[in-house]
Amino acid sequence: MTIQPQLHHVALTVSDLETSVDWYTDLFGFAELVRDEHTEGGGHAVVIGKPDWSMFVVLNHHPTNQGETFDPTRTGLDHVGFTVSDRTELLEWEHRLADKGVKHSPITDHDWGSSLNFRDPDDMQLQLVAFGQN
């Protein structure tokens, strides 16, 4: 038997918890699901996502965070990708990002579909992907 897990959530360390909570909930329409204190080392976490918990993002703030800028070229996270239904929805997202003042790449077409990149308040790269024909 082959067991293939599915990605359920991602946890990000952010420099300003409230700024990130506001940004992600406003842009993606996520709900705030839980606020929690870390049991080890202090700090706080806010879980945002779909109300049914089928997909969520954990935003963490650690008291030892010195406000370093995210760097995708270092070992660790490169980017976080979200899927959309098709290229038409990707175009809608391109307009939504522009309307909210979020800088973004142009839509790039690939053999496998299309993508669009942008960054969050901590400069973490996010990607929207539409699989299938362009």
PLM regions: where:
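Acetyl-CoA-dependent GNAT
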Residues: 60-66, 130-133
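Short, conserved charged micro-motifs
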Residues: 19, 88-92
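Helix-adjacent hinge/juxtasegments
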Residues: 59, 70-74, 78-80
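Vicinal oxygen chelate
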Residues: 2-3, 44, 94-134
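N-terminal beta-strand motif that seeds the catalytic metal site of vicinal oxygen chelate
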Residues: 1-19, 77-82, 132-134
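A short, acidic/glycine-rich surface segment
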Residues: 43, 64-69, 104
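Core segments of cupin and vicinal oxygen chelate
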Residues: 4, 13-56, 61
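Localized chelating/binding microdomains
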Residues: 26-28, 83, 92, 101
